[in-house]
């Protein structure tokens, strides 16, 4: 396992002490693996007719800068712990982008944080994890968060 892709759903809650980060650090240090931290931002869309498009673009740019900084800080913390880590902020469909980047980077393992929810929530809202699981060509590890 030389290449690990760790997915981050929420940049604001991803810290060096997050369960998904701790598990990734454990695996990466044990195997001397490279870690690719990925966060997929939503694809660009047309603004509603009643919203100023310049204001919306500024707001989106500010949010993307914030997410990028969070990912870079997490990557830096991992590097300070002697883990070869890089951060990726991409835009698009979560399933497609995670699969695309996993193939492009030739990862050996995808690590995904998994929230504990009831069966109703899982039936209605959990398509991302199932989509990646169904289409991935490499192993996937789910970490409870």
Map each language-model feature to its residues:
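Short, hinge-like loop/turn segments at secondary-structure boundaries
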Residues: 53-56, 104-106, 128-130
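A short acidic, glycine-rich active-site loop
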Residues: 55-69
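Glycine-rich, Arg-bearing micro-motifs that act as flexible, cationic patches
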Residues: 109-135
